[in-house]
């Protein structure tokens, strides 16, 4: 638990903090993709203006177990003044999850208010952080940010934020 503010910039502070359950969880990518979010640097940002936190993990067993541990810490009052909004599970591979991992996600889901699953997005493997579009709640509903406004056709990758990231971002912002 941080006893000093994590946010040291003079810019507007983030509304939501992303706490990585482990290295490589995806916090940097998600913080870049969601305008109101920032990485907490592996600590509970209890001294910051906005204490809202989303735990981020990959969908492999070690990631899910660590996210569950952190969720239980928060639930047990060990996260200072932070308010846990939920857990974002980022797919670690394409395809369907094995049954044991699905069950672990269900256990985590029962322990938190919200759980957002981010599927495997191949486009993220080839994009630099600078190329990632940003979902911003000020730009309107996620539905309008992920489809062409006239034709309702899908927009080419990387010209708009991926629909899965947009809808998860919107869900987190509304939580």
Residue ranges of model-derived segments:
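Extreme N-terminal, non-catalytic leader segments
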Residues: 1-16, 173-174
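A short, well-structured beta->alpha microelement
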Residues: 3-6, 33-49
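Glycine-rich phosphate-binding P-loop
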Residues: 15-36
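Inter-motif core of Ras-like GTPase G domains
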Residues: 42-59, 71-87
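Conserved Switch II/interswitch segment of TRAFAC-class P-loop GTPases
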Residues: 51-67, 92-98
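Conserved C-terminal guanine-recognition region of P-loop GTPase G domains, centered on the G4
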Residues: 68-112
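Beta-strand-loop-alpha "switch" segments that mediate conformational coupling across diverse proteins
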Residues: 107-137
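C-terminal boundary of histidine-terminating zinc-finger modules
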Residues: 130-159
């Amino acid at each position: 638990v941080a006893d000093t503010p994590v946010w040291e910039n003079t810019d507007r502070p983030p509304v939501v903090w992303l706490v990585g359950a482990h290295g490589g969880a995806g916090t940097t990518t998600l913080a870049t993709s969601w305008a109101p979010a920032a990485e907490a640097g592996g600590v509970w940002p209890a001294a910051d203006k906005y204490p809202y936190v989303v735990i981020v993990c990959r969908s492999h067993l070690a990631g899910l177990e660590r996210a569950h541990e952190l969720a239980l810490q928060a639930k047990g009052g060990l996260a200072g003044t932070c308010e846990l909004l939920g857990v974002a599970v980022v797919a670690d591979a394409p395809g369907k999850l094995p049954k044991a991992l699905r069950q672990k996600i269900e256990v985590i889901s029962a322990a938190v208010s919200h759980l957002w699953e981010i599927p495997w997005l191949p486009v993220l493997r080839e994009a630099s952080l600078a190329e990632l579009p940003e979902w911003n709640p000020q730009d309107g509903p996620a539905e309008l940010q992920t489809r062409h406004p006239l034709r309702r056709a899908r927009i080419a990758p990387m010209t708009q934020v991926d629909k899965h990231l947009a809808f998860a971002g919107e869900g987190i912002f509304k939580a």
